[in-house]
């Protein structure tokens, strides 16, 4: 659907699991003081190991993405006489991707970003110590065809650090221990996924595994039509309707819901979970994960910016939008920035997150049925944490699903990422979710102080690393730690995103414009 002079929801770039969106207003991080007289610690025996890039190109989804991308350079390529000046509001991945494809099609794209950094949900900046602070913890799945194709076209595939084909979970009932789904090379989907689950002996019993499979068979046979029909059900309602074991919720679905939408499974539409599962189950390398080898600003956003600028486009930072000024007939006359500058273009694209779009809609548009659909969408808050410790914690070179009441996923970035590598100290990056009643949480953590959030997180880490986290009087949640724990927190950052991805609650999929645009 194309709206005159405005294309809403520009090219939506698929990003990683812990998925913070474009956020014009973020709380800047706080830092605990460094302990410069800390004792010397032994280096970790764990060595970062990257794996060869999987064959992500050999899927129908990738081929389709590649064909669509190539069409901008060929069949959709504008004649020089038809070249248009396009203003893009928002410099997240959506805005950068939109500018890239418009440049391929021969148009002049200019991005107007409100903040002083690009990337939106993948933005990053340096603190006073020179350490990088990221808006969100991101990984890249093999089943992200648009992003994989983008990396190929930008010639930056070598910046992805592919990890072993596994999914790693913390064991709630066995603090300090982990278990995994191991994908055996050479076995095609969906059999590799099924075998990985069958081989794991710590999460579900064999009867529970057998009981889980039948409700998912219609998804494989009927595909998206069955998936879309489940939108009226939450994850937990779907489980009970189809007789799935209750423990599948505790063992798997809670982790999936919090990773996909920062929300508890009793609040999340089953369509979201089934859509992800269907993609992963149908692509042999779909669940293999990669980390970016450094900060997202330099390693991802900069090559996208360079690509656009080399083709005549431009990027404007610190250029927040004040108003979309319309003509009497409702068409756009110009954009008005907060600086007072007027921006005139032939076409205008919104690459803003839904809550910002709702605030910026001109009065003439607000009662249009198309835009009224935005009323149904509300962003979910999420918090991203960086925590530097004075020594190495027990770590894995991978993403970990914490299965914690407060934490979604985390990674020891000193092990998983080349730029952040440190043989002596751990730096954990964690996604704190759910953090509001809307998402199923009991506490509005977005309204809490940074110190309260970190203290609660230290309590969860004490459970995950019971023999390693020290009893530290700075953090009351660690007061029950025994004498063996030695690791203390040196520094932290707290990045709050009050409005993140929209809440995909049951019954909203068929009503909203995003489902219409994707069909």
Where are these regions (language model features)?
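Glycine-rich FAD pyrophosphate-binding loop
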Residues: 103-128
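Mobile amphipathic helical/loop "lid" adjacent to a hydrophobic cofactor/ligand pocket
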Residues: 147-148, 152-153, 157-274, 282
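Glycine-rich active-site loop/strand segments that organize a redox cofactor
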Residues: 120-143, 220-221
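Helical element adjacent to the flavin cofactor pocket in flavoenzyme catalytic cores
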Residues: 274-347, 351
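Conserved flavin/dinucleotide-binding core of flavoenzymes
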Residues: 49-75, 397-401, 406-519
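Mid-domain catalytic core of redox enzymes
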Residues: 60, 82, 319-441, 451-465
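N-terminal chloroplast transit peptides
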Residues: 1-33
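N-terminal Rossmann-like FAD-binding beta1-loop-alpha1 element of flavoenzymes
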Residues: 83-111
């Amino acid at each position: 659907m194309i709206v005159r002079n405005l294309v809403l929801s520009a090219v939506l770039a698929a990003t990683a699991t812990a998925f913070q969106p474009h956020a014009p207003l973020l709380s800047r991080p706080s830092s605990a003081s460094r302990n410069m007289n800390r004792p010397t610690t032994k280096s970790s025996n764990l060595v970062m190991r990257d794996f060869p890039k999987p064959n992500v190109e050999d899927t129908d989804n990738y081929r389709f993405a590649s064909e669509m991308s190539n069409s901008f350079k060929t069949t959709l390529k504008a004649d020089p006489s038809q070249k248009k000046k396009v203003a893009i509001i928002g410099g997240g991945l959506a805005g950068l991707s939109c500018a890239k494809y418009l440049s391929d099609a021969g148009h002049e794209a200019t991005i107007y970003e409100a903040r002083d950094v690009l990337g939106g949900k993948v933005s990053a900046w340096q603190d006073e110590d020179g350490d990088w602070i990221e808006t969100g913890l991101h990984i890249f799945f093999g089943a992200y065809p648009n992003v994989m194709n983008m990396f190929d076209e930008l010639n930056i595939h070598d910046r992805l650090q592919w990890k072993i084909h596994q999914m790693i979970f913390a064991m709630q009932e066995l603090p300090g221990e982990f278990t995994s789904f191991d994908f055996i090379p050479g076995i095609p989907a969906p059999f590799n996924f099924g075998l990985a689950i069958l081989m794991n002996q710590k999460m579900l019993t064999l009867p529970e595994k057998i009981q889980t499979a039948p409700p998912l068979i219609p998804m494989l046979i009927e595909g998206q039509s069955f998936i879309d029909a489940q939108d009226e059900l939450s994850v937990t309602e779907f489980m009970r309707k189809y007789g799935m074991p209750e423990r599948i919720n505790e063992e798997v679905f809670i982790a999936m819901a919090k990773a996909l939408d920062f929300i508890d499974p009793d609040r999340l539409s089953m369509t979201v979970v089934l859509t992800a599962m269907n993609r992963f189950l149908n692509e042999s390398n779909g669940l293999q994960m990669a980390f970016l080898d450094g900060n997202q600003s330099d390693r991802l956003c900069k090559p996208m910016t360079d690509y656009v600028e080399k083709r005549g486009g431009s990027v404007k930072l610190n250029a927040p939008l004040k108003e979309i000024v319309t003509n009497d007939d409702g068409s756009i006359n110009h954009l008005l920035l907060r600086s007072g500058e007027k921006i005139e273009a032939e076409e205008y694209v919104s690459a803003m997150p839904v809550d910002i779009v709702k605030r910026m809609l001109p009065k003439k548009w607000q009662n249009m049925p198309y835009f009224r659909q935005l009323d149904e969408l509300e962003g979910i808050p999420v918090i991203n944490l960086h925590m530097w410790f004075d020594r190495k914690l027990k770590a894995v070179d991978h993403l970990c699903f914490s299965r914690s009441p407060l934490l979604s996923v985390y990674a020891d970035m000193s092990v998983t990422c080349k730029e952040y590598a440190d043989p002596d100290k751990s730096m954990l990056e964690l996604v704190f979710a759910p953090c509001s009643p809307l998402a199923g949480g009991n506490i509005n953590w977005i309204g809490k102080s940074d110190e309260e959030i970190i203290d609660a997180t230290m309590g969860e880490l004490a459970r995950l690393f019971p023999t390693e986290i020290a009893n530290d009087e700075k953090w009351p949640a660690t007061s029950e730690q025994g004498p063996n724990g030695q690791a203390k927190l040196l520094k932290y950052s707290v990045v709050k995103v009050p409005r993140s991805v929209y809440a995909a609650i049951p019954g909203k999929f068929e009503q909203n414009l995003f489902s219409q645009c994707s069909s």
